[in-house]
Amino acid sequence: MDLQKGNLFLTMLAKIKIFNGKKITIRPLLKKDLKLPEKFRKFINSLITENAQVAFNKKLSLKEERIFLKNTLSQIKKRFGVFIVAEHNKIVVGTASITLKGNRQNHVGEYGITVRKDYRGIGLGGYLTEEIIKLSQKQLKPTPKIIRLSVFSTNKPAINLYKKHGFKKVAEIPNQMEYNGKLVGETIMLLQL
């Protein structure tokens, strides 16, 4: 199979799953997505507008989103990262990724997930978590032995989701994130594979 013809490392095919009565397509990030940066920008910027507990707090420009997509596809091509997209009616409603940390931490994959507000609490986040971990084991070289994540200590629904999927809290660093004018802690969690 030629992995460069628009479908980079396509061992994960698109799947349609039903969550709370909504047909959601789960698929890998594709080269053709470079032509659609606006739909990804709208998704990310919706989280900023919502004031979600995510690390970034500034809306992205179209140029910044294009650069992000290009860099992510480059990581996928090098087998250094995996990235999946959840879409409902062609609107991005969630993403999940794992990227190898590199060098002496090449056995560690950094996990990230974002889900649009109206799609939380319906099982989508858990499904994306399972799928991205499975995909990381198939595609990343070297295969990660540890998945690491960082989350706002105040984001209890996310922490509970991660615990449900086997992540263990290993550290809480106080005053690492600024949220709503206050400093809040950062919780570090690991999943040993």
Placement of each model-derived feature along the sequence:
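Conserved GNAT acetyl-CoA-binding A-motif
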Residues: 108, 136-150
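A short, well-structured alpha-helix characteristic of acyl/acetyltransferase catalytic modules
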Residues: 6-59
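Conserved acetyl-CoA-binding loop-helix of GNAT-fold acetyltransferases
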Residues: 115, 121-138, 160-164
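Hydrophobic adenine-recognition pocket in adenosine-nucleotide-binding enzymes
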Residues: 29, 113-115, 151
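Acetyl-CoA-dependent GNAT
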Residues: 19, 58-118, 129, 135, ...
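C-terminal "cap" of GNAT-fold acetyltransferases
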Residues: 145-148, 152-159, 164, 175-193
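Terminal substrate-recognition subdomain of acyl/acetyltransferases
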Residues: 2-20, 173-175, 182-193
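A secondary-structure capping/hinge motif
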Residues: 169-171
